[in-house]
Amino acid sequence: MSIHIAAQQGEIADKILLPGDPLRAKFIAENFLDDAVCFNEVRNMFGYTGTYKGHCVSVMGTGMGMPSISIYARELIVDYGVKKLIRVGTAGSLNEEVHVRELVLAQAAATNSNIVRNDWPQYDFPQIASFDLLDKAYHIAKKLGMTTHVGNVLSSDVFYSNYFEKNIELGKWGVKAVEMEAAALYYLAAQYHVDALAIMTISDSLVNPDEDTTAEERQNTFTDMMKVGLETLIAE
């Protein structure tokens, strides 16, 4: 057991999907995994281990924001030996070419958080995805016919930002979307020498406000990213 995860050693696979919403973790376990067993209910942050196409895979919620995913990802890596971590979540488009329900693979993650600067105040340490996972995910998504964008994202510390226009301005510099977790996940992956990737479904748009989705859609649909994430985890 770790501080925030109730699993015993051996109950969590070395490959895991990380949705922010614990109910999305439950949805993935019930709809994609065979023989799924719940290994964690602490703080209602549900985690499950099962099999996908014969491969042992886990899925667990992380909550919202970089502090929350940092806690769970670190414990999964350090206490349970997880080697491949793929975030599957939602993001808001910052780019007019990126539309609702399309996929974004975060090649890198800029951030306005001090989560990295606290450790490296003298450097702008880049948060980047595992190239191996990124390459596999891109080709899997294209093979499945999914509209997929690859590029930089913004991992924001603030959801209700007072600097809304600044976020939109980043879209003009090629930033695809804004979300709240990828930079922290990539930073931990660099620190502990594991592989990480963030796959997001666009749930709304900061530049096309007429594009939107409901809370129920965000919880129970967006299955494309789940399929890509699972296929990427088991790809040789």
Curated annotation (Swiss-Prot):
The record marks 218 as: Important for catalytic activity. CDD domains: PNP_EcPNPI-like. The active site is at 204 (proton donor). A purine D-ribonucleoside binds at residues 4, 179-181, 203-204. Keywords: Glycosyltransferase, Transferase. GO terms for biological process: purine nucleoside catabolic process. Catalyzes the reversible phosphorolytic breakdown of the N-glycosidic bond in the beta-(deoxy)ribonucleoside molecules, with the formation of the corresponding free purine bases and pentose-1-phosphate. Homohexamer; trimer of homodimers. PANTHER family: FI09636P-RELATED, URIDINE PHOSPHORYLASE. This is Purine nucleoside phosphorylase DeoD-type. It comes from Streptococcus pneumoniae (strain CGSP14). The gene is deoD.
